[in-house]
Amino acid sequence: MNTFDEATTRLIDSTDGDVYAHTPPTPTAADELAAAKAAQAAIISAARTVAGSQPVTVNKIPYDAGPQSQKNASGKMVASMAGQVTFPTQWRDANNKTQSLSQIQFANMVTAIYAQVEEVYEKSFALKDAIEAAETIEDVQAINWS
């Protein structure tokens, strides 16, 4: 009976039909650092998505600011600039309550949403730059959203 360490060895079927045991090379320190950087960048991207989806508050009213709200707000803003929206216009807030917004109130809400998006992306870019500049796995893992 053949035995092998399943954690590190793979069986490879060759062209002649024989099966050979193959142990992949041990990752280098550079490989491990690159993997840690990729993992930490993915964590930052996930945190960015969550942070960018938090409601924004305008005049004490919370509004959804997630990806769908961003699309809806952009579309309606473009339509309003083309004269296709009458004001006051209706918009649902984060509590699912209909708000009647003047053109200025609507513009302020859209501006708040995109200010949040800009802030979140700037933070994400800075953190990812720090990850790329880190020289040890410990330094990489110390870079967090909070």
Regions found by a protein language model. Give the residues of each.
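A preference for well-ordered globular domain cores
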Residues: 1-146
